[in-house]
Regions:
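Bacterial flagellar/type III secretion structural subunits and associated motility module proteins
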Residues: 1-107, 113-174
Length: 174
C-alpha cells in the first residue's frame, strides 16, 4: 500500500495475504478530526485575585465524572493557582492535557485540551467543567474561565472513491 502524498495520507495494508489486492483508492481529506479545547481567561500573573480557601469543580466526560479540589493560600498569586490546576489536571491522567498560554500583555490563561478527537452525534462535548455549588467555587471558576469551550471536538471528513465518510480520529480501515 502506498500514498501519493504521505504528508496528507498514509496507507498500510493489514490483510492476511502476502500480496494485497490491486484495487486503488482515492482519498480526499476535507477536514481532520479535532480535539475539544477549553481556554480560560487571561489573568495577570502577579496579582492575587483568589481568596484563600478550598475550591472544587466537577469535570464531566460522556462516561465519567471527576471532582477536583484545590486550595489557595494567601501567598498564591494568579500564576500559582493556574500552575496548581495545570499540574492537578495533568497528573490525573484522565485524557486531558493542561497547559498555559501567554498573551502579548504577559497574562496567562489555562488551556485544557482533550486527548480524544471527534464526537458522536448524540454528544454535546467531550468534557464539561462545572463549579461546586458553593459561591466561592463559582466565583473562582468564573475568574479562571476554564469552562469556556474555545474549540469544539470535530470528526474528520473525507471522500473515499467519491463517497463521503467521517471518522472520530485520523485513522480508519477500508
Amino acid at each position: 500500500a502506498q500514498s501519493s502524498d504521505e504528508d496528507v495520507v498514509t496507507a498500510e495494508y493489514i490483510g492476511n495475504d502476502a500480496t494485497p489486492d490491486t484495487a486503488s483508492f482515492h482519498i480526499a481529506v476535507k477536514q481532520l478530526a479535532t480535539e475539544q479545547i477549553n481556554q480560560g481567561n487571561y489573568l495577570q500573573p502577579d496579582r492575587y485575585q483568589f481568596t484563600p480557601g478550598i475550591y472544587s469543580f466537577d469535570l464531566n466526560t460522556n462516561t465519567n465524572s471527576y471532582e477536583f479540589q484545590f486550595s489557595v493560600d494567601r501567598k498564591d498569586s494568579n500564576a500559582d493557582v493556574q500552575q496548581k490546576l495545570m499540574q492537578l489536571i495533568n497528573h490525573s491522567k484522565i485524557g486531558l492535557n493542561a497547559s498555559m498560554d501567554q498573551n502579548g500583555k504577559g497574562e496567562n490563561a489555562l488551556v485544557l485540551s482533550s486527548s480524544q478527537t471527534g464526537i458522536a452525534d448524540d454528544e454535546d462535548y467531550l468534557f464539561q467543567i462545572l463549579p461546586d455549588a458553593s459561591p466561592s467555587s463559582m466565583l473562582a471558576l468564573k475568574l479562571l474561565g476554564i469552562n469556556q469551550i474555545a474549540q469544539e471536538a470535530g470528526n474528520s471528513s473525507f471522500g473515499l472513491n467519491g463517497k463521503d465518510h467521517s471518522s472520530y480520529s485520523y485513522s480508519f480501515m477500508v
